[in-house]
């Protein structure tokens, strides 16, 4: 290994260790309800969420009630994300005109995202609308990570309390994880990514003319945008001469930031952080790796 490589690794661990104490102090104050510096900004939004959702923030839950609330929330998220994928062809923010995601793939993706699983069976840039990417996948990147953080905090409360019939309030832990921890960190990281060239736009794909035409096999799709299969179940293709290339863009930075902070493997592009529109410079690469280890 080169000296430069060792220096980069050393710098990474130095920055990570330097952030452990202040971030840990901050998170402890968030979960114990103490002033943490973001109260004036996020406090009104937190109270508004409680009022709208009918949550009594001072009401404690035992472990059974906590578990039921967690399961109910995530099952609702599973259904919502599945329906969003199936109906995306009829919904706005779909400049490329993508049709509905196949039922099995929609369920696969929904179950993956609500469980914060590092799994991706889709190519987002060629299959999902901007609305699905934002309202579906990005939202689940936040709340699935917040769910895991809430459960860990509840476990810590249960282990550290000598005698306690309650372990907190799931809705409060979920809300505070999102508003006070994940959202501010994601906003800062997204701005850094955009400053380095990560894409963030509602514009449709850009088309550029190739210097030399390329012949390739293109899948044949039906009116719904699904592959047409032959008698053996394989996708039918046709030879096509390509003279231009579509460069997929979209609201990328906002999703990439929480994807790495929440350690959820589903990204905007099929190649994830190996794609130059997600991870264009050495600085963004460093920041994304740091984000993955920062909370986890």
Label each region the model flagged:
Residues 1-108, 129, 152-153, 160-168, ...:
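N-terminal alpha-helical transmembrane segments of multi-pass membrane transport
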Residues 8-16, 133-146, 248:
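Alpha-helical transmembrane segments
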Residues 68-78, 141-150, 288-296:
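Hydrophobic alpha-helical transmembrane segments
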Residues 89-137, 200-290:
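P-loop potassium selectivity filter motif centered on the GYG triad
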Residues 106-121, 138-146, 150, 154, ...:
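Mid-bilayer segments of alpha-helical transmembrane spans in multi-pass integral membrane proteins
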Residues 156-157, 287:
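Helix-loop-helix junctions and helix-breaking kinks within/between transmembrane helices
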Residues 163, 282, 294-295:
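Short, glycine/acidic-rich beta->alpha junctions
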